[in-house]
Every structure is written in C-alpha cells, then in structure tokens.
From Swiss-Prot:
This is Thymidylate synthase. Pathway: Pyrimidine metabolism; dTTP biosynthesis. It catalyses: dUMP + (6R)-5,10-methylene-5,6,7,8-tetrahydrofolate = 7,8-dihydrofolate + dTMP. CDD domains: TS_Pyrimidine_HMase (cd00351). It comes from Mycoplasma pneumoniae (strain ATCC 29342 / M129 / Subtype 1). It is an enzyme of class 2 (transferase). Gene3D superfamilies: Thymidylate synthase/dCMP hydroxymethylase domain. Catalyzes the reductive methylation of 2'-deoxyuridine-5'-monophosphate (dUMP) to 2'-deoxythymidine-5'-monophosphate (dTMP) while utilizing 5,10-methylenetetrahydrofolate (mTHF) as the methyl donor and reductant in the reaction, yielding dihydrofolate (DHF) as a by-product. This enzymatic reaction provides an intracellular de novo source of dTMP, an essential precursor for DNA biosynthesis. Keywords: Cytoplasm, Methyltransferase, Nucleotide biosynthesis, Transferase. It is found in: Cytoplasm.
Length: 287
C-alpha cells in the first residue's frame, strides 16, 4: 500500500524527536491523512506479513462489547497482553510471575481472568455502552433510516472513564458516510504507532466498514484515516526502513460468508483471499 509507505517516508524525513509516556522515544509529526478505496480490494499491508487472525478477533471482541483479554488469549491473540500484565505486577497478588505465566493462568483460570484480565472500559465498552448508549447499534439503525445524516459517529473517548482504562483509546472516533449506495468511514486516531499499530488500524476499520455495509445493505466505499500524533518509535526505525525497500504486492480481498447480524459474526464467517505478502518483520510494542 503506497499510502502507508508514503506516511512512513514522510515521518522519517520530517518527524521531530518526541519523548512520551513510554520508555521508548521516537520521531513524529502532527496531522496526517490517508485515503483508501476499499470497494474492490482490501487494504492489508503487503510489505510485511500482518497477523490477520488478530485483526479479526480484536474487531469481533470490540463489537461484542468485551474488555477482558480472555477471549483474545483463548484465540491465541496476544496484542493486548502487556497492559493487564503490567497492572497485575503492581498488585499485592504478584509473586514474580513472568508474562507468559500470567497469560497461561488467564487461559486456564476463569476467576483469575475475571479479576486480572480486564482492561477497564476500553473500546468495546464505549462502542456498546457509552454512559448507557449502545453507539454501534444506534449508528447502524441511523444508517438504515437516515443514511445522509452527518451524525453517524461512534466515540471511544469517554472523559468520564478514560482514567479507568489501562490504555486510553488511540483510535478515538469514527464517522460513517453514505453516498451512491456505498458506505465509507473516517477514523480520527489521536496517536498512531506507524510500524505496529497503523497497519492493524487500517485493516480493522476497513473490515468494520465491510461488516456494517453488509448489515445495512450497502457496498464498501472508502476508508479515510486521519492521525493526530503519527510516530515511529526509535526501536522501529530500521524495520520501517526495511519496509521502504520492498515493493508493494497486489492487495487481497475479503469475503463475508454469512448473512447473520454483525453482532453474531464469528471468525470463520470472514475469509481473506489472495493475501500475498513479504516476510514478517518483528518489533517490540511500547507499553
């Protein structure tokens, strides 16, 4: 995807040093926007392998309103493990367990998972219960009856609850837009980790468009990605530079294999077709 490579190159060339809350500094810019046509192909990065299983399970987890990592852990999705583990280490119940041991106990012990696996009122909670409002269900209903509304918005940023979240929402607000039978979406992301996070976010919200479009008898249109603080961590610089040496491959397609409600979708109902990619590039997450 050339749009992603252009973003990475722009931040490498124009980014300024940015200290932050983590122990890993980086370079960043403020305010960047990408446009993706998702009507025929699916924007899953090809200059490295992106873990499709994690993207799908995380989105289904959001849609179900879940905020506990047990569902993810049970499905071998490890993208949220660090934050509950860091919280557990500060509790009086911590006895020197490694993160691997902590996650294994989450998998095996439902009571332990209920106590220590929760991230607080993060995305799923806000999408499905923002101070009592089921935003996702409400916006889908509005698309069906008033598709030209300018209020087709879901916010994950709840000032009343943000301090209770182990990680405040990076992708903070999204808006749907209907034109000529197509559904489009714009995401505002307050903070974007270009190497690890942004490829996931592009794919996740594009998949959300596919699911909501099917639910509302529309076709996928476009995805617009607006990033506030777009940054590359210093321990990802070489990985980004490696990606810039790779030629993007043709984009895959996504097939939705079920007519069930978006709220009942399962992993096997979603099929990724013809995903041709360059090899995996590893990088550590900044917690």
């Amino acid at each position: 995807m050339q749009q992603y490579l252009d973003l990475a190159r722009y931040v490498l060339e124009h980014g300024k040093y940015r200290p932050n809350r983590t122990d890993t500094a980086g370079i960043g810019v403020f305010g960047y926007q990408m446009h993706f046509d998702i009507s025929k192909h699916f924007p899953l990065l090809t200059t490295k392998k992106v873990h499709w299983k994690s993207i799908v399970h995380e989105l289904l987890w959001f849609i179900k309103g879940d905020t506990n990592i047990k569902y993810l852990v049970d499905n071998k999705v490890n993208i949220w493990n660090e934050w509950p583990y860091e919280s557990f280490k500060k509790s009086p119940h911590f006895n020197g367990e490694s993160q691997k041991e902590f996650i294994e106990r989450i998998r095996q012990d439902a009571k332990f998972a209920q106590q220590f696996g929760n991230l607080g009122p993060v995305y799923g909670k806000q999408w499905r219960d923002f101070n009592g409002v089921d935003q996702l269900k409400k916006v889908i209903a509005q698309i069906k009856v008033n598709p030209f509304s300018r209020r087709l918005i879901v916010s994950s940023w709840n000032p009343n609850e943000v301090d209770q979240m182990l990680l405040p929402p990076c992708h903070s607000l999204y808006q749907f837009y209907v034109q000529d039978g197509q559904l489009s979406c714009q995401l505002y992301q307050r903070s974007g980790d270009i190497f690890l996070g942004i490829p996931f976010n592009i794919a996740s919200y594009s998949l959300l468009v596919y699911l909501v479009a099917k639910e509302t008898n529309l076709k996928p249109g476009s995805f617009v990605h607006t990033i506030g603080d777009a940054h590359i961590y210093e321990n990802h610089l070489e990985q980004i530079k490696l990606q810039l040496t790779r030629q993007p491959k043709p984009l895959p397609k996504v097939v939705l294999k079920s007519d069930k409600s978006i709220f009942d979708y399962q992993f096997d109902d979603i099929e990724l077709v013809d995903y041709d990619h360059h090899p995996t590039i590893k990088g550590e997450v900044a917690v």
